[in-house]
Amino acid sequence: MTKMIKKTTWFALALLLTASCRRQDEAAADSHVVRCAVIGGMTMTGLWQQIGKMFEADTGYHIEVVATGPRPVLDAAMRAGKVDLLTMHSGDITTDLVADGYGINMRPWTRNELCIVGPPDDPAHIRGMTNGAAALRKIAAAKAHFVDFEGIGSRELVHTLWRLAGAEPKGDWVLRDDTVSKFNILQFARTNDAYVVVGYIPAQSGLMPATGMEILVQGDPIMRRPFIVMETNPQKISGVNSAGAKALSDYLLSPKVQSFLLEFGRWPKGPGPIFFPIPAAQP
């Protein structure tokens, strides 16, 4: 009986895998379907779903989100030939996709914003500031605890802010990030009564639990990170819907979507906006 159950289970799994592969093959062959890999923040907030509805209504294409989540997941999906288009934060991963021949026509199309989160008693008195560098300068002057977060995007931007602040994050007031998961960084900061720079979306949405912490500084254009869009290279991957990917990529940079970003960009739990247009966006 046990052997029969195992055989039945494996047979069922094989059928599921076969069906899944068949659906992917059919999608790849369907010129009306655009398979996408989308960074998690866009699907979590509903931005991508709204843009998808607009695109489908205006063009007749159908968007299929094949992969969503952190950047490594999207990177793997493009390299495996599962998607026609990818959108995520710019960085080494996206540059490597282009350098390795998987991605083409990489263009920025929107930005999100980072913020400074800290304890409610705000020992450095930065609450309400809209200049990140000036806020860090005050944190350094007060020698208030500050977490050197290891998050890829945050770390790059914070280095820029410290340079603009004309201060160095050195001393026992600078705490090393030793969290196992980046989503625990606000809890770590709370435990140490410290400030930290993180993305506004995960902080405001609860993706990074922030009990006992407050968003104190936001609204600085310098604290914004670009998202790029790129199409899969048909010379590297077969079965790519290049026409559909190009149409969607151009659509993201269209005046209609760029205007919509600010209309959409109000987080239900906070003042927003969440996403920002690219001033020079042109298809």
Task: Briefly describe each language-model feature range.
Residues 2-10:
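Bacterial N-terminal signal peptides that target proteins for export
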Residues 72:
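Conserved Nudix-box catalytic region and its N-terminal flanking loop in Nudix hydrolases
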Residues 111-113, 226:
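Extracellular structured ligand-interaction cores
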Residues 10-18:
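Bacterial N-terminal signal peptides
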Residues 116:
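Serine endopeptidase catalytic core focused on the charge-relay Asp
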Residues 21-62, 67, 76-82, 91, ...:
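Exported/periplasmic ABC-transporter solute-binding proteins
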Residues 85-111:
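Acidic, polar ligand-binding/catalytic clefts
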